[in-house]
Amino acid sequence: MFGFLFKKIFGSKNDRYLRRLRSQVQSINALEPQMQELADEDFAARILQYKKAVQEDGQSLDALLPEVFALVREASRRVLGMRHYDMQLIGGMVLHKGKIAEMKTGEGKTLVATLPVVLNALSGKGVHVVTVNDYLAKRDAAWMGQLYGFLGLSTGVIVHGLDDDERKQQYESDITYGTNNEFGFDYLRDNMKFYGHQLVQRGHNYAIVDEVDSILIDEARTPLIISGASDESVGMYRIVDEVVCKLRPEHYTVDEKARTAMLTDEGVAYCEEMLKLDNLFDPANITAQHHVLQSLKAHQVFKRDVDYIVQDDQVVIVDEFTGRLMAGRRYSDGLHQALEAKEGVTIAAENQTLASITFQNYFRLYDKLSGMTGTADTEAVEFHQIYNLEVISIPPNRPMQRKDYPDLIYRSRQEKFDAIVEAITELHKNRQPVLVGTISIETSEMLSHRLSKLGVPHNVLNAKQHEKEAEIVAQAGQPGKVTIATNMAGRGTDIVLGEGVVDLGGLHILGTERHESRRIDNQLRGRSGRQGDPGSSRFYLSLEDDLMRLFGSDRIKGLMEKLGLRDGEAIENAMVTRAVEGAQKRVEAHHFEVRKTLLDYDNVMNQQREVIYALRRELMVEEDLDPVMDEFMNDVLDDVYSTLDGVPVDDHNGLREAAFARLRDVFNLDRVLPENAHLPEREECEPLIRKVLEELRSETGDSYRDIQRYFMLEELDRCWKEHLRNMDALRDGIGLRGYGQRDPKLEYKREGFEMFQAMLFQIRENVFRALSRVRVAPAETAPVEAIEIAPETEEAQGQPLAREYRHKEDRGQLSYSGGGNAEDARNTPAKAAPRIGRNDPCPCGSGRKYKKCCGADK
């Protein structure tokens, strides 16, 4: 009661925050006459002046906000013909403060972003504007780039297909547009490079995420993964698929809520008989068991034209939230191969994770993060808990006039779609445009087929027809237009009403099914009623819809039975609408827990990732790596000699002998020790190791530092890749610890830490084991063919190329032997040295590019 009165008198927290910002709006407006007097060439000069004040004089961005916002508003009026409204100024301030601005469709979010973008670009550290697809990134960069260019700021855009040099150039711009995937993958690829000059990103200063709910919430369950092909055979998938596709309903059970499928006892017996196995769950048959369960999931849980489509001999995932194709993305853990076997297309090799990060942890790298969307309030708690982002709702510039009608609920899907087709036909006759939202490609194509039979012209927009997406969406407001869109693809493109449509009631939104998330439904509704335009919306549901069937209340079904509704009749009741929203809240809570659990587990990996990437960055950019080598050496020596504490000289258990053997193996001490040598004391061992390294330094000359860097990075990458695989395996089975009354998350954290510590130690030992065995052989007697290490997947483009090391003046070439004698060398695979890139620094030490120096004649 008290809280209600407090809000009534003083307003909500949101209202009070907006009131504080309005005083700054007055300051900005007061500067408008002054800005209008400036000549065009004065704008860029002003920006340079502000840059100097921030970068050299230490002036805060907050102090410059009124002047910069006023300058940008006037520049926008001159260049784009658009002047920022007061509410757009407030939206810009909210973004600058590192919060999420919730602004309804048509309120000009793209223009709002220019205000904080210019202000934060003054620091010279770069600003990233994150969009949901390449089309919007290119469109906004070209459109708003006119304004930034007028102000003397450079604009870049990161899209698929750019090489590293082009990407680096775009990131050097003051403002860089791109998709969340491109930014995330560039970060991962940067942490797989070998040299500091190969890095494309220059830090994570400030990001504005457009459609922030789509990127930070909807896609948070899908980690970014760079993977390479593993050595697993794919033949088993076909064999298992032939068995699983013959299973009968009594052989398995399906949990649609959890999206899982399990074999019954009859199913297990059938699979054992068909695969000729004694016990499917025997540890020796763990691979076969995994294949069977993934194939069962592919057949019974995943649906064609809903979860994926088949295109060009490939299984392509469909984004469940946007309806767009996710080209290049693959399900992990063998599920994608099971789907390929199910559909009879070519089965690609299984992948092994080389690098991964979730969007949650990627975007938390930024010093300041903000976002814009039309629908964030329903997820405000999650934004606050996971990203520490506050959601501020910005009132529309003009009052909303859209009418949102109550849902209509039918008993069956057939009755529902009959009513939908009838409603579309009636609206088309009246020339009122209608946008029909579906949640699957299957539904959109079924509706399209029925409308075609009735002779109703229409456009279909789904993952199969996405090339003209923006054009189709932009035309959806013309008189008589019928547009069918899957999961509201086309966000970011305004639907402008055609001539006379306002008098017809504006754009009508017709939802064929409620989505699991209220926010997605609100996004669909938000396509109508922009900038105070009239509009309307209504959802059509049935008791057979997935949401109603899995999460809906039995009360609705009971009510419909009591009312004795006849075929084709619908129930329209506020209680029903509330019950549907209650079902959606339960689903949202479930998905929130899934995302939070994913983050809890990824936080363990994130801490480890930060340590590895920091070490990797140091190895890439530091000129002198000897201090790191000294640290590695002392860590190994401390560990070896700590095992001998209290062990007598006349050790009968062989501990001293084992320690000596380990030292000789790791540091290749046989290279400098006399025959019949015994374990040296701790202080005597260090000079021996330095002697081994000094011999290598004298043999390799100026190439020593490159060789040193190469082996350190190579061992770090190899061990990290293996560690990722081990952590995946640990994660897969950790849930079983719950049966032993142990917390799986704590167990994962503890064991993951132990595995990480062991990996770090393995890196230290392997670096010395490899480096101490390098030999320089005469070039004419031991030619080494230069090769390029090709990435296995498209996502892995930009992986480092290993180096070809030549002795100074080309007197010799590197070889790597695996031990101290010829027998060891014969049994160890040789490491071929890849070629030098033409734009890389010349290894002769001149400081010039290879193509301008020793490679000029090649």
From Swiss-Prot:
The keyword Signal does not apply. It is a peripheral membrane protein. GO terms for cellular component: cell envelope Sec protein transport complex; cytosol; plasma membrane. One of its GO terms (biological process) is protein import. Its EC number is 7.4.2.8. It catalyses: ATP + H2O + cellular proteinSide 1 = ADP + phosphate + cellular proteinSide 2. Keywords: ATP-binding, Cell inner membrane, Cell membrane, Cytoplasm, Membrane, Metal-binding, Nucleotide-binding, Protein transport, Translocase, Translocation, Transport, Zinc. One of its GO terms (molecular function) is protein-exporting ATPase activity. It holds the Pfam family SecA_SW. Zn(2+) binds at C842, C844, C853, C854. ATP binds at Q88, G106, E107, G108, K109, T110, D494. The keyword Transit peptide does not apply. May bind 1 zinc ion per subunit. Part of the Sec protein translocase complex. Interacts with the SecYEG preprotein conducting channel. Has a central role in coupling the hydrolysis of ATP to the transfer of proteins into and across the cell membrane, serving as an ATP-driven molecular motor driving the stepwise translocation of polypeptide chains across the membrane. Belongs to the SecA family. Monomer and homodimer. Part of the essential Sec protein translocation apparatus which comprises SecA, SecYEG and auxiliary proteins SecDF-YajC and YidC. This is Protein translocase subunit SecA. It comes from Desulfovibrio desulfuricans (strain ATCC 27774 / DSM 6949 / MB).
